Amino acid sequence: MGLEDERKMLTESGDPEKEEEEEEELVDPLTTVREQCEQLEKCVKARERLELCDKRVSSRSRTEEDCTEELLDFLHARDHCVAYKLFNNLK
């Protein structure tokens, strides 16, 4: 057994498929729950209002209107759902 073989044994198992299994990618439960909550009817409606406001504001060259209220409504609806579901997914 040569020096190169010993290094290979110390640094890797030699089987790429086995290494991939060992390195499972962790998924943030917050991201998953947020995506699920964004599909609910209340969040979909709030997002639609936000997108309409964004189009309206973007189409004007001069306006004092912003979409702060619509953004906060959407985030409130989504985060209300997330707060209810998130802790059920934690281990």
Swiss-Prot record:
Keywords: Acetylation, Disulfide bond, Electron transport, Membrane, Mitochondrion, Mitochondrion inner membrane, Respiratory chain, Transit peptide, Transport
Biased segments, Basic and acidic residues type: 1-10
Disulfide-linked positions: C37-C81, C53-C67
SUPFAM superfamilies: Non-heme 11 kDa protein of cytochrome bc1 complex (Ubiquinol-cytochrome c reductase) (SSF81531)
Acidic residues compositional bias, start-end: 17-27
GO molecular function: ubiquinol-cytochrome-c reductase activity
Region described as Disordered: spans on this chain: 1-30
InterPro entries per the UniProt record, alphabetical: Cyt_b-c1_6 (IPR003422), Ubol_cytC_Rdtase_hinge_dom (IPR023184), Ubol_cytC_Rdtase_hinge_dom_sf (IPR036811)
Name this protein carries in UniProt: Cytochrome b-c1 complex subunit 6, mitochondrial
Species: Macaca fascicularis
This protein's encoding gene: UQCRH
